[in-house]
Regions:
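Iron-sulfur-associated redox domains of electron-transfer enzymes in respiratory
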Residues: 2-109, 150, 154, 159
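Ferredoxin-type iron-sulfur electron-transfer modules in oxidoreductases and energy-metabolism complexes
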Residues: 40-52, 96-244
Length: 244
């Protein structure tokens, strides 16, 4: 084995796309492996880049255990959870393309989380009926708010993600918002009125856009089409039929 071959096995070449003043700037970075067989996660690469070559590199991370979702970035154009996504030779790390970029790999997330503010009820009384929730309900509550599901979502694509716009929330919905609404529908302590309100909110956010959509993909594997979108569409049709 030559010295060059050994050196190549000790490093990994990646592109990190920084962002400033509305412009992207691709930067080549050579990640130094801790050992020859290491398969570094994207977050490992970003942290080392910040410690060595790019001290001002901005990115988000939290739990480092795929529990919080804030570290999500695009890897080769697809959303990935940085703390649990292996990086390979010549991969490109970039801010999520589905949300406004603030700087480098940091995107504005609050317009998603604020979308349902004041529009859905918050259950604070506990489960006084001692009713067990379904397995599907518990699966939906495992959402980590990574927003990977926004990728290729025709409903979310109706929103403008121009960073110069200061809207508090988006007009049209997305799989995450629909998941939150379907969680209310499936909550055993929700009243019929609360469930109907949640379904109506889904319709108002543009649920009809989902009719011709092949389905959305969750960053942690929740069946969004089968357990969120399709049930909401069925429920909305039932409500519409009852009104006429």
């Amino acid at each position: 084995m030559t010295t060059k071959d050994t050196k190549d096995r000790q490093h990994l070449n990646v592109t990190i796309v920084t962002h400033s003043e509305g412009k992207d700037m691709p930067i080549n970075f050579k990640y130094k492996k801790r050992h020859e067989r290491e398969k570094p996660m994207a977050l490992d690469v970003l942290l080392q880049a910040q410690e060595t070559k790019l001290p001002d590199l901005a990115f988000r991370y939290g739990c480092r255990a795929r529990n919080c979702g804030v570290c999500t970035i695009d890897i080769n154009g697809l959303p990935r959870i940085a703390c649990r996504s292996v990086v390979r030779e010549n991969d490109k790390l970039k801010a999520m393309s589905t949300l406004p970029v603030i700087t480098d790999l940091v995107v504005r997330r609050d317009q998603i989380s604020r979308q349902l503010r004041g529009k859905i009820y918050r259950n604070s009384g506990g489960n006084d009926l001692n009713v067990d929730a379904s397995e599907d309900y518990h699966e939906l509550t495992s959402c980590i708010e990574c927003y990977a599901c926004l990728h290729n979502c025709p409903m979310h694509q109706k929103n403008s993600i121009d960073p110069s716009e200061s809207n508090e929330s988006y007009e049209y919905g997305n799989p995450f918002s629909l998941l939150k609404l379907q969680t209310i529908v499936m909550d055993p302590v929700s009243s019929n009125s609360q469930k109907n309100d949640a379904i109506t909110q889904a319709v108002n956010l543009g649920l009809d856009t989902c009719l011709n959509c092949p389905g959305c993909k969750c960053g942690i594997g929740i069946d969004l089409k089968g357990k969120v979108v399709d049930p909401l569409i069925t429920a909305s049709k039932k409500i519409a039929d009852e009104q006429f």
